């Protein structure tokens, strides 16, 4: 298969991104823990989420609402896509999602007027400064315990390895949101984006070596240390390591949410291709082998459901919401139909809805990348 793009990023765009990212990484220092105190968020610094009995629930657990962020122009200028088209696709996702659960949309003060015009009146707006619109990565990862309480894992955000400065407002977004929502936050001096991990809610976490072992995130690449940070912060018990994410991906460095996702405890959806000439063939086969050889935190062998690769975007980058699954689709009807058919079988109790995500793909993401759930307690 001739894969001109991954998630819809053209070859020329990739080249410019790669050179720009390299320059940005040299010019912008990779920062550590931000100063959260001016946000007024309640910080929990004396213990860890796991020690306090908190964990990050699976995406299919009931949501109170979903956090999204209306993208500003900053990182879209070089894509040659009208900003109205970009925001229009965000609005398509948000408006459809709002039919199934509440949506909290973060907007810059100067964008409030356009937000009121393009979003459903059911969507709540909150004003904060932001640098980009990928709430999966910059938003808070909300944890729960058995007492009906919520706290947040405040991982550090550094603009995907310093590639897209400035990112200081995005680095503070989780703290500002937690203050707004009155949710205490554990400040974690470790860089992690939400799209880099997937959990099953029963102690198992999926990730990729390509992202988490990348020194543009954290200097330490010792697996045991990384696993300890993840388990202590997200309440997981076992980390399953896949190798690389799909290629090419100069932005996220192989986020798991473009390659694989838990569908339920013990079941993993995995993108695969039968085209041996596809550079992703070996990546997908390696991921499949690792999953088949693994057991989860409960000792179960994993059931791996293969989802055929689309030439233009990642169908795996779906979002499991209350009573529905929102799936990125492209202009390739045959690829869409195959993916949607498989997902309808996997999620029989939810309505599977395909939404055009080609513009999201041009920016290197999908529906999962622009959504972050707040679990119901």
Task: Describe each PLM feature range.
Residues 26-377:
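The feature marks the mature, well-folded catalytic cores of soluble enzymes
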